[in-house]
Amino acid sequence: MRAARARELVAEGDQPTAVARVAQISRQAIYKPPRRRPPAAGPGVPGAADAAIVEIAKANPTDGTRMIAAIAGRELDEAINRKRVQRIMRTHRLLQPIRGLDRRRRPGFFRVTRPNELWHMDMTKVWTAQHGWVYLHAIVDCCTREIPAWTLDLRGRTDEAIACVESGVLGHRVSAGTLTLGTDNGTQFTSRGFRRHLSGRGITHRRGGYRDPESQAFIESWFGQFKKRVAWRAEWETINEARRDIAEYIDTYHHRPHSGLRYRTPTEVAQTWRTLNNSAT
């Protein structure tokens, strides 16, 4: 406002130097023509990218703005700013409350240098109408975040846990003496048969502390996301229906960005390691 009034005084014949001194502005502000801001776009009609971001956010209601931006960037093949995603999601009321940030934080426990060096394994249960509770064993590779093996059975005994380990070892051709398997202190994992099987396979068994889920952070996190995205929203009639949906979810999981991998996918990270190994041999 002072610059505009100063220009009016100069136009009426006053000296620019004196006007600038009294108005406490620079002479450049008097001589420089005012720059008009373009009119605000207003709500208007959203572009194709904005509409795509909305659809992605609706399809992934448990994900935050960073993950939605990463997924949208891949699908649209362009860089998507997180703040843009946040603005769009806020406009469409798609933002979720941020969970408490005062939860206990610890320095990283795990230092892995290659795939098949450290696996985390655990068991959870899901509900089916016909069979009641059924038991899901799953293993996550702490390097690539892939799921090397999983099983869904009517029981959660030692035999089912061993079968899951065998599936992962055979499927990934794990050599003896190269793998450490981390579990909690569940009865099937502390059983004599399970420990004997790991010893026979040359697998080092590392058990976490009691009431310490952070010692199994990767598999606990994976189960948490699986339950939010699939298990709590599903109504399975039979165990076969559950197996079908879990298999589909794991395939999708392998090809979606992972925040722990700097928003690369587990499949991409695993392929990078395979390429490095092939070039080294």
Label every model-predicted segment.
Residues 16-22, 68, 72:
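Short alpha-helical "recognition helix" segments of helix-turn-helix
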Residues 199-203, 224-281:
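C-terminal domain-tail junction helix/linker
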Residues 141-142, 152-157:
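A short acidic/small-residue loop/turn micro-motif
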Residues 19, 98-102, 180-185, 200-218, ...:
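RNase H-like polynucleotidyl transferase catalytic core
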Residues 1-14, 50-59:
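Short, amphipathic alpha-helical "recognition" segments used to contact nucleic acids or chromatin
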Residues 13-15, 63, 237:
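Residue-level signal for the short linker/turn that defines the boundary of a DNA-recognition helix
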Residues 27-118, 212-213, 265-277:
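Basic, flexible linker segments flanking DNA-binding modules
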Residues 78-140, 160-167, 171-178, 281:
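Mobile-element integrase/transposase regions
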